């Protein structure tokens, strides 16, 4: 009789232990009540949040097919920081996407006609996508040409007319300028940097530092971050959902009348 009791207790104990182990591996559930009064179970198991810019995605980032130097912690950290600055959570506007839809149909075929990589269209957004007008240095238009440079590449700039504000004509001028810069540097990232600060300055830094890799050159803060901005602009325009952008409805839109016109 005692043996039967011991065997019965042992079986019960084994079943309890097995049930405990099974419960330990089950996801936690919580009850929730819907409007119609029915009760459903909701899985509350915690998951690891995704990184803002996974390393696998970082390897795919590029400007005009020139990629980031992988394994460079400084470059990767800077890229993540600039990308974060262009998320919807930071900008709170879809103005960039509206400008891209308005400008790119005019810009893209012109760049292609001059053999310029399509990614250079993002210079227009970086220069004028969030804020248009004339800079304190005198640069104006979507491509932010200085008066002297604009005239060199065929634009009329005087008291009566300023073709820097003509999307089509200024894009043709920009394409000519970019193509000329490529003949000097033979690197699209260096061309972008030279567009920002001037070819003389970039050439001087290349000679001084004996370095012709944009990502390894020590440049001033604005130029040193310029290509990172272009890559970030490309990312948020081509992959809007990844960076928090939603359809225009409900967004805090930046309302400003477009001052530029495209002429055929």
Each predicted region: which residue ranges?
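An acidic, Gly/Ser/Thr/Pro-rich helix-cap/linker signature
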Residues: 2-114, 245-251, 258-263
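Residues that scaffold the ATP/ADP-binding catalytic core of kinase and kinase-like folds
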Residues: 133, 152-153, 205
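Catalytic and substrate-binding regions of cell-wall glycan-acting enzymes that process beta-1,4-linked
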Residues: 43-86, 141-144, 148, 158, ...
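Solvent-exposed, acidic/flexible segments
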Residues: 89, 93-104, 113-116, 135-143, ...
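Solvent-exposed, polar/charged alpha-helical surfaces in well-ordered, non-transmembrane soluble domains
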Residues: 105, 109, 121, 172-179, ...
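Short, functionally critical alpha-helical segments immediately adjacent to catalytic or ligand/cofactor-binding
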Residues: 116-131, 191-196
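Substrate-binding/active-site groove segments that recognize
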Residues: 138-159, 173, 178
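Short polybasic/polar patches that bind polyanions
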Residues: 109-112, 151, 207
